[in-house]
Amino acid sequence: LSSAASDVYKRQIHNYLKDEKLTEDLTLTFTKHSEMRYGENPHQSAASYVIPGNVEPNIMNAKIHQGKKLSYNNIMDADGALACVREFDETACVVVKHANPCGVAIGDDILDVYQRAFNADSLSAFGGIIAFNRTCTKEVADAIAKVFVEIVIAPGFEKEALEVFKKKKNLRVLELGKFNKREKKIEIRNVDGGIPVSYTHLTLP
């Protein structure tokens, strides 16, 4: 199974494992979403798959306003950025590069939050992925446009912000719609011969 569909994969697992009851049998069905130029490395073939009917905001069903097709590594990094930023109730920004967060900040003002997250490690943030859990404003878009990043992710974008981003033709802009913090999620690991599955609680009881 391609881990490119990891987030929606977890949601389907959740439907099978309601109330934390681990069933005896688990059947998963996916539909091909798109072919990719290559996988994690140039010599590897790859494709992305989605769960039919899944409507929860995720990278696979995001509205892509502009930019070229997402690569395998783009999807993995974007999914990681989204998973991190959606954990916060406060206004938050997460910067991810090569599957690792290199800047995270929370606060009241989205521009201040972006600047602190980016400046936490501005060298690593160069060419990275930026995710917000609030609507991206024109003011924030103006700041992002001054640096090189691969992808910007947010629940929504002001019309003026999208106009700013249009000047950066290679930038991917992903709109997910409103998403909420989850109390728990399913963790799946792909190992030879099977998949270990467990619940991870995101809030304290």
Predicted regions and their residues:
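Single conserved hydrophobic/aromatic residue that forms the stacking wall/gate
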Residues: 1-5, 9, 201-204
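ATP-dependent carboxylate/acyl-activation modules
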Residues: 10-202
